């Protein structure tokens, strides 16, 4: 995904792109290649002094990079006062139109809980607990349910593999 307006949800389907840009007179065509397979934006890295610094977690996990480039991968955790050097590093980004609560075990009043794993009912990012499936579903679920609910909560997501990218996106999306 890359056709998103600043700080809003990233589109994962052609109709999401249309909704963002339907009033833009410069947009004349949208190519529909189906839903995105990964569902999250790319991993952004900085190659510096024979090191791979992860600036933004994405579809390629730190573990996958470490497998290909042992002892060269460094995770960069952005500090509040650091300069933004890559897309998606704003503290508030990827946000739905309604409040989002993260690491929720139960829904609060007037709130939809989006689950993860076998202990949650529908809607569920992945009943099987697949982080790849959850990443693929994340933005399309948020786009769909922000139109139907005034508040959304998301169950805890393991912070490993592509789960780091999922948690990064929902943490930024939950900022007010």
Predicted region positions:
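Active-site-adjacent structural elements in enzyme catalytic cores
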Residues: 1-176
């Amino acid at each position: 995904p890359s056709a998103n307006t600043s700080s809003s949800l990233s589109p994962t389907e052609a109709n999401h792109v249309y909704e963002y840009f339907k009033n833009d007179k410069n947009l004349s065509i949208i190519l529909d290649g189906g839903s995105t397979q990964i569902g999250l934006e790319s991993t952004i890295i900085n190659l510096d002094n024979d090191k791979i610094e992860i600036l933004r977690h994405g579809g390629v996990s730190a573990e996958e990079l470490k497998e290909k480039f042992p002892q060269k991968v460094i995770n960069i955790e952005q500090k509040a006062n650091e300069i933004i050097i890559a897309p998606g590093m704003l503290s508030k980004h990827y946000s739905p139109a309604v409040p989002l609560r993260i690491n929720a075990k139960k829904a609060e009043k007037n709130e939809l809980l989006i689950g993860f794993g076998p202990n949650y009912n529908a809607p569920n990012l992945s009943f099987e607990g697949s982080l790849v499936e959850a990443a693929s579903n994340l933005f399309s679920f948020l786009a769909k349910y922000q139109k139907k609910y005034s508040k959304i909560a998301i169950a805890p997501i393991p912070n490993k593999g592509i789960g780091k990218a999922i948690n990064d996106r929902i943490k930024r999306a939950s900022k007010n």
